[in-house]
Design a protein with these regions (language model features):
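Cys/His-rich short segments
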Residues: 1
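Short boundary motifs at domain starts and secondary-structure transition points
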Residues: 5-10, 164-165
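Short amphipathic alpha-helical segments and helix-helix/interface helices
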Residues: 6-7, 26-30, 82, 135-138
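Class I SAM-dependent methyltransferase SAM/SAH-binding core
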Residues: 8-55
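A short acidic, Gly/Pro-enriched loop at the edge of an enzyme's catalytic core
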Residues: 53-66
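A short SAM/SAH-binding and catalytic strip from SAM-dependent methyltransferases
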Residues: 64-76
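S-adenosyl-L-methionine-dependent methyltransferase catalytic module, highlighting the catalytic core
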Residues: 76-85, 90-178
Length: 178
């Protein structure tokens, strides 16, 4: 965000929607004077708005920026969630829709018959995940309507910053636009 956008410019007023806000980002963005910052989550006490990502209580084309990191892998109907994200994003708006991804997989794997937490952890990487995304994730976002840039920032920043920010080497981040 710092390198590629005007997100941190005080003159650039942005309406931001942040799903399942991470503590470190929450504090930073809440104090950012140029941001009209709204957090949402179905369960988190940090959330300004308690909402289901598949049925958002916001008007169409409302947000300049949407941050949704490591949420979609928990959502049974991720297509509906992606459609809702697209709906509330303004034309020209930016969405960071990061997920855990297995780039060795061509296609996403989901199986809703797997309900045992230990089995989910083994297969999907965490007990409350309902799928493991493959390389087709970016195309799924495109099929919703997003323009997607696939960014590997770990190849563009110093190794010590990769370590500092706990980035996974080679992780591809979808930078999406409407």
């Amino acid at each position: 965000l710092n390198e590629k956008t005007d997100f941190f410019f005080l003159s650039a007023k942005k309406k931001v929607l942040h799903f399942a806000p991470e503590q470190a980002f929450y504090k930073l963005f809440r104090n950012q004077k140029n941001l009209d910052y709204t957090t949402t989550d179905l369960f988190s006490p940090l959330a300004d708005v308690k909402a289901d990502i598949c049925n958002l209580p916001f008007e169409d084309n409302q947000y300049d920026v949407i941050l949704c990191n490591h949420v979609l892998e928990h959502i049974p109907d991720d297509t509906k969630a992606m459609q809702e994200l697209y709906r509330v994003l303004k034309p020209g708006g930016l969405a960071i829709l990061q997920i855990p991804q297995d780039l060795s997989r061509a296609t996403t794997f989901a199986d809703d018959t797997i309900t045992d937490q230990k089995e989910r952890a083994k297969i999907f990487g965490q007990y409350d995940h309902v799928r493991i995304y493959g390389r087709d994730y970016f195309d799924k976002l495109r099929s919703i309507g997003f323009k997607v840039i696939e960014e590997d920032y770990t190849n563009k920043i110093a190794p010590e910053l990769v370590e500092k920010y706990c980035l996974a080497k080679g992780e591809i981040i979808p930078v999406c636009f409407k």
